[in-house]
Every structure is written in structure tokens, then in C-alpha cells.
């Protein structure tokens, strides 16, 4: 099975359609199995989709199937698709085509699966199609075409955390499905439905299992993380015999007590986001906010059906930084939205210059089938979108370099992700995996992934940091 890896430097958001590590898990590929009932798996899209893939893979292993990273050895291939933007749809259809050509027996699931007719039109030979988070339906179809093998569950035990496609030291924790917002450029509610929050006790149980298994960083994800619990109507859940309010602040507070890094993604700018900042200042959760703002022109924001008071957003950013000076803010924006004028775009650049955001990603508007935005105003030409994209990134590169430079000379905790012949590569609290920068510790080849080390930052650019390990005894002397 050929696995293409999306370059995180090219796109800087977790929503990026990308083939993930379906073949990178050696534990799966090399899992002992005498059944011969082998399932191939291709996972595309964002971390929310990755979590869905992990759940399906876990159930496959529980049922006794072997998961293989080879088309040739697979009795059937599952493709978990993304359908967020047209580029993702194209990539998903290409992945289905490849699976059909290389294997012939394919089940399609995921976001694009909600558009069965579109898939059937291109690939009529697909065996079955299900929509997103249709775990039981996927397993039912697998059982139909590849009978559930007889196996002894005690000889192939599954970890309590289930199958994970991420490195062992970090994991994504999905706390809800769906979204109640109706942004005109987005079709997620049509694909995944309205907000459906997991019970707080279930979320915390999973988080506890992850930490007990050695996970050192929990990345909290959903379509609308800050809306967690809104659909519960204020009802309280229970965990470890104690009541837990079902809202994002209460959940984050409990997660922060587990001893792992807790990083929040996809924070919609609701007023109660203010309540999260003190938790960051206290060190309970990482001082990191992934808060997609999308634009800064009130007119464009209104057309997007997004919060339109940019002055309030700037005031909030200033307020948050006063409470938590270490706060790192990541955001994403869209340029070339239908009807965007040069004046609208200049407002966006002015906002960047004033807000001084740490990490920023930019998308050129892409038509999404079924999105309201496609027809609300005149579409912007590709040449104009390309020009605005480069001007946007040029402005932000200078700001990002300035924000990263403040870490030079500072001693920080670095979580090691990889080690090669040149040294160790890790991340600080300011860096989410795959989408942000890295911390390079040259020459330290004896470190191992998952280690948390102390290092002093020696150099920075607009993306990354360089550091040297700190001698523990020397640091103790300084602190004394």
C-alpha cells in the first residue's frame, strides 16, 4: 500500500485533507494473527477522522481481524474519506480508485461517504458506502464480505486505549461530533450532523486510560470544541463518583489534573473562552489556543456567518495575554472568499499586524459542493486569490518570526517526537504536532521519542526553534 504524507509546511491547519499514518503503525502491520482474515485500511483527513479510524481499527482487532498495510495481502480494503473541500474530495476519490485497482474489494466510509451518489458515479464497483462515525455499519459490512474469524481473544489482547495511529506519546481525544454553527463555507453539519457531545465521564475515562498507557500529550479535538456540552442543557455527568459539569471549562479543568499536556484545538470564539485562560495561566492546560477566526472584514464575516466584531476579538486577545503572557494563539483564515474586495483584504492584513498572532494558516477559498458561500457573491479569480495568499503569508511570516524570537534564551520543556542521525526533534508547549513548528536539538542522538527534556532555546526563525539540553545539576544550581 502506498502512503502519501501531506507536508505540514504546505498547509497549517488540522482540517487539511491528508493521508495519515495508516501504514505507520508497526504494531498493527506486524500484529500476530493466524486467521488470514486481513483488512487493509486507508485513513484520510483531519484528526477527528483519525479518531474514527482508530475506533474502527480497534473493533476490527477485537473481532480477530488482522490489519495489513499491503493491498496484496488484504481480503478487503476500508477507505475512511474526507469531504471537507474539493481538494479533499478529489484525494479521497483517488484513494478509492487506487484501492479498487490494487485490491478490488473496497468499503468506503467517512465524510465523503455521506455523498453516496457522488462516489457511485465515479466508482460504481465499491462494495458498500457509509457516512461518518458509522462504526457499526462498517463492521457489519466487513462481516458480510470477510466473515468474522474464530480467534482466542486472550492471545491477541488489545490495549485498553484501543488501536492508535499516532506515536505512543500523544493522542487525539475527540469530545463531540457535529456542529450547530452554519458557516456558509462549510458543509460539516450536513456531513456529521448537529452538535453531539460525549458524556464527560466517558471522555475522562478515555483520557485516564491514555495517560496510564504513557501518553504525555492529549490533543482535544471536535468540530466545535468550545461548544462542548451545549447540547446537554446544563446536565451534570459523573466521573469517579463525583459530579462533573458538562462544559469545556469544567472538562478542561479535569483533564488538566491528569498529569499530561492538554492542548485545545478548534476553539470557536464564544465569550466563555475567557474562562479557559486562567486554567492556562495556572499551568493546568497548555497556554495554547487554536481559534479559527477566518477573516477580519465585518462584511465578509457576516457573509460567512461568523462573529463579526473584530474590535472585540482584539480586546479579547489583549485580555487573554494580560492574564496569561505565555499564551500562544494559532488561527486560520480564508482569502479570496466570494465577494472579497481589496479593501476587505487590507482589513485582514491590518488585523494580522495588530493582533500579532503566533501561528497562522491561510487557505485560498475553495468551492465546496453544497456550500452556501459558492453563490452568495461573485467568485474571486485564482490569480487574485494566489496574490492575496502570498501577501498574507509574507505579512504573517514577519510576525511569527518576531513572536518566536521571544523564546530565545529561555529554558523550556521539550517533548521529543523523533530522533535521527543529526539529533532530536521535539516540540514545546507552543507547537502542536504536524501543523506548527519544531524544536531541533542537534547532536542529541541518545534521546528517545516520548522523552520530556529541559532545553534552552538558542535560535529561532519564522517556523522553528533550535535548542541545547540543559544540565540538570547546573539548572538546580541556578534555581538555588
UniProtKB/Swiss-Prot annotation:
Protein name: Ribosomal protein uS12 methylthiotransferase RimO
EC number: 2.8.4.4
Positions of [4Fe-4S] cluster 2 binding: 179, 183, 186
Domain MTTase N-terminal: 37-147
NCBIfam families named among the record's database cross-references: 30S ribosomal protein S12 methylthiotransferase RimO, MiaB/RimO family radical SAM methylthiotransferase
InterPro entries: Elp3/MiaA/NifB-like_rSAM (IPR006638), Methylthiotransferase (IPR005839), Methylthiotransferase_CS (IPR020612), Methylthiotransferase_N (IPR013848), Methylthiotransferase_N_sf (IPR038135), NA-bd_OB-fold (IPR012340), Ribosomal_uS12_MeSTrfase_RimO (IPR005840), rSAM (IPR007197)
EC class of the enzyme, as a word: transferase
GO CC, one annotated term: cytosol
Keywords: 4Fe-4S, Cytoplasm, Iron, Iron-sulfur, Metal-binding, S-adenosyl-L-methionine, Transferase
Molecular-function GO term, any one: protein methylthiotransferase activity
Pfam family, one: TRAM_2
GO annotation (BP), single: tRNA modification
Names of the cofactor(s): [4Fe-4S] cluster
Subcellular location: Cytoplasm
Binding site for [4Fe-4S] cluster 1: 46, 82, 111
Reaction catalyzed: L-aspartate(89)-[ribosomal protein uS12]-hydrogen + (sulfur carrier)-SH + AH2 + 2 S-adenosyl-L-methionine = 3-methylsulfanyl-L-aspartate(89)-[ribosomal protein uS12]-hydrogen + (sulfur carrier)-H + 5'-deoxyadenosine + L-methionine + A + S-adenosyl-L-homocysteine + 2 H(+)
PANTHER family: RIBOSOMAL PROTEIN S12 METHYLTHIOTRANSFERASE RIMO, RIBOSOMAL PROTEIN US12 METHYLTHIOTRANSFERASE RIMO
Amino acid at each position: 500500500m502506498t502512503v502519501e504524507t501531506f507536508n505540514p509546511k504546505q498547509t497549517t491547519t488540522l482540517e487539511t485533507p491528508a493521508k495519515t499514518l495508516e501504514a505507520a503503525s508497526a504494531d498493527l502491520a506486524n500484529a500476530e494473527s493466524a486467521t488470514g482474515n486481513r483488512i487493509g485500511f486507508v485513513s484520510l483527513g483531519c484528526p477527528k477522522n483519525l479518531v474514527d479510524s482508530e475506533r474502527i481499527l480497534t473493533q476490527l482487532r477485537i473481532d480477530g481481524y488482522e490489519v495489513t498495510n499491503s493491498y496484496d495481502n488484504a481480503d478487503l480494503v476500508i477507505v475512511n474519506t474526507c469531504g471537507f473541500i474539493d481538494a479533499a474530495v478529489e484525494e479521497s476519490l483517488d484513494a478509492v480508485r487506487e484501492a479498487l485497482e490494487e485490491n478490488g474489494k473496497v468499503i468506503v466510509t467517512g465524510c465523503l461517504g455521506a455523498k453516496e451518489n457522488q462516489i457511485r458515479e465515479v466508482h460504481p464497483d465499491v462494495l458498500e458506502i457509509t457516512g461518518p462515525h458509522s462504526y457499526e455499519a462498517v463492521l457489519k459490512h466487513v462481516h458480510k464480505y470477510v466473515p468474522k474469524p474464530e480467534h482466542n481473544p486472550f492471545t491477541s489482547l488489545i490495549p485498553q486505549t484501543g488501536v492508535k495511529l499516532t506515536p505512543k506519546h500523544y493522542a487525539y481525544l475527540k469530545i463531540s461530533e457535529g456542529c450547530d454553527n452554519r458557516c456558509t463555507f462549510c458543509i460539516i453539519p450536513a456531513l456529521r450532523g448537529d452538535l453531539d457531545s460525549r458524556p464527560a465521564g466517558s471522555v475522562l475515562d478515555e483520557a485516564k486510560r491514555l495517560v496510564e498507557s504513557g501518553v504525555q500529550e492529549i490533543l482535544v479535538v471536535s468540530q466545535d470544541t468550545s461548544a462542548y456540552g451545549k447540547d446537554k442543557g446544563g446536565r451534570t455527568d459523573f466521573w469517579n463518583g463525583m459530579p462533573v459539569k458538562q462544559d469545556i471549562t469544567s472538562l478542561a479543568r479535569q483533564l488538566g489534573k491528569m498529569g499530561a499536556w492538554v492542548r485545545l484545538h478548534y476553539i470557536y470564539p464564544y465569550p466563555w473562552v475567557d474562562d479557559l485562560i486562567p486554567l492556562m495561566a495556572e499551568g493546568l492546560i497548555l497556554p495554547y489556543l487554536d481559534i479559527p477566526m477566518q477573516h477580519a472584514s465585518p462584511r465578509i464575516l457576516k457573509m460567512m456567518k461568523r462573529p463579526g466584531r473584530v474590535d472585540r476579538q482584539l480586546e479579547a486577545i489583549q485580555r487573554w495575554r494580560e492574564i496569561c503572557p505565555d499564551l500562544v494563539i494559532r488561527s486560520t483564515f480564508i482569502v479570496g472568499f466570494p465577494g472579497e474586495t481589496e479593501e476587505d483584504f487590507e482589513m485582514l492584513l491590518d488585523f494580522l499586524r495588530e493582533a500579532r498572532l503566533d501561528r497562522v494558516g491561510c487557505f485560498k477559498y475553495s468551492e465546496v459542493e453544497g456550500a452556501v458561500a459558492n453563490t452568495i457573491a461573485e467568485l474571486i479569480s485564482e490569480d487574485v486569490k494566489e496574490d492575496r495568499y502570498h501577501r498574507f503569508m509574507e505579512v504573517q511570516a514577519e510576525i511569527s518570526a518576531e513572536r518566536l524570537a521571544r523564546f530565545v534564551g529561555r529554558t523550556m520543556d521539550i517533548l521529543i517526537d523523533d530522533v535521527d542521525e543529526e539529533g532530536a526533534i521535539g516540540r514545546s508547549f507552543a507547537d502542536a504536532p504536524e501543523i506548527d513548528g519544531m524544536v531541533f536539538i542537534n547532536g542529541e542522538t541518545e534521546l528517545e521519542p516520548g522523552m520530556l527534556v529541559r532545553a534552552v532555546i538558542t535560535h529561532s526563525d519564522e517556523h522553528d526553534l533550535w535548542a541545547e539540553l540543559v544540565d540538570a545539576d547546573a539548572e538546580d544550581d541556578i534555581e538555588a
